[in-house]
Amino acid sequence: MGSLALEAGKIYGLVGPNGAGKTTLMKCICGLLRPDGGVLEIDNQQVEVANSEILSQVGTNFINSDSLKGFSLEYIYNDHVFYHRLKKSFTLENLLDEVGLDVNKKMKFDAMSLGMKQRFLLGLSTIHKPSLVLLDEPFNGLDPDGVDLFIENVKSLSNDRALIISSHVLRDMETFLDYVIFIEGGSILKMKSMFEIRKEYKEGLKDYYDEQKQKCN
């Protein structure tokens, strides 16, 4: 795996063919998997599976939705606050408002649409103020209005933290990314700024992605 240094306040898109290792890389970063080699650090501390202190600096949407069935949004929020030992200065109402969900806090998680679940998990992933947020395929289930709202949420959330987003929806991604990371075979092959991509490629991110993919064949 190649070297990669992330900057707070920037949004990184993780792209690559199916099976390239995008989700695996993100799970290694948040301590769910051990990397085969190399070292991962967050705020100059090495990421380890059992290091709860450093892993608390990471927010993710890697939550098994099935495990939340039957629970209300209020219960899930309170459980998250308790786990991260947070003060309730940022309330559930604040969270719902931030991600544009006009729902009752007693609503069951499984009663929401897939898009609503995605937005709720986005808000939940950041209430403990992590320095790094990882979002895997966050556009799944979002209608066009939901995508627009999600993009606005992401922009506001990236002010003081780094975000890594993995998605196959390149057209939506290129509207807000700062950098694109291309991965294949579990290795980071290249990182390029969206500014450069827009200048060099007529069709933007799609052309860049196709070129990098062709080089791997």
What are these regions (language model features)?
Residues 38-49, 53-54:
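Conserved ABC transporter NBD signature motif
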Residues 30:
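Helix-to-loop junction immediately C-terminal to a conserved catalytic motif
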Residues 69-85:
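Q-loop/switch helix immediately C-terminal to the Walker
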Residues 12-17:
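The feature captures the beta-strand-to-loop junction immediately N-terminal to the Walker
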Residues 78, 89-104:
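Conserved ABC ATPase "signature" region
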